Design a protein with these regions (language model features):
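Active-site nucleophilic cysteine motif
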Residues: 119-151
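Non-catalytic ligand/cofactor/substrate-binding and regulatory segments of enzyme domains
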Residues: 1-124, 152
């Protein structure tokens, strides 16, 4: 979370899934922290553990710069339910079984796809959410994740 916004990366486009969801288009989303936690707890029925890292102002500036670099390589993408409601306001979420549609319905998160580069394709064993977090945090000089082998 940064400035009250959750940033997540995964294979959220069900239409692009291959290998049982292990591979697909890399999708980044941003959501309001409180709305996202509420969604996770009440929609997904998940217990949420929130961890933080204390960064200096200099490190935080580097993290923001890393995020800005990523943002130059993304383009807006809309989940199926969001597109449906734009075309017909009476669309029913019950007609959509993809996670990103439910997430958008519950949080109005903004979704993005990568235009090119290593995050364009999500792969559960390497190019995943942990790898993206490490990419961002490494800009601040942290060495939290060992990125050899399977990254989890």
């Amino acid at each position: 979370m940064l400035n009250g916004t959750v940033i997540s990366y995964g294979n959220y486009d069900k239409a692009s899934e291959r290998l049982f969801g292990g591979i697909g288009d890399g999708v980044l989303f941003k959501a309001d922290f409180d709305k996202y936690i509420n969604f996770c707890v009440y929609h997904d029925l998940q217990m949420v553990f929130d961890f933080g890292i204390k960064l200096s102002e200099k490190q935080l500036a580097k993290v923001r710069k890393g995020i800005a670099k990523l943002e130059r390589n993304i383009t807006r993408w809309k989940p199926p339910y969001q597109l449906a409601t734009e075309n017909s306001p009476i669309s029913d979420i019950a007609d959509f079984d993809d996670y990103c549609s439910s997430l958008w319905n519950g949080t109005h998160a903004r979704f993005y796809k990568f235009k090119s580069g290593r995050f364009k394709t999500y792969f559960v064993m390497s190019t995943n959410c942990v790898f993206l977090a490490d990419y961002i945090l490494s800009k601040a000089g942290t060495d939290i994740v060992k990125t050899a082998g399977i990254i989890t």
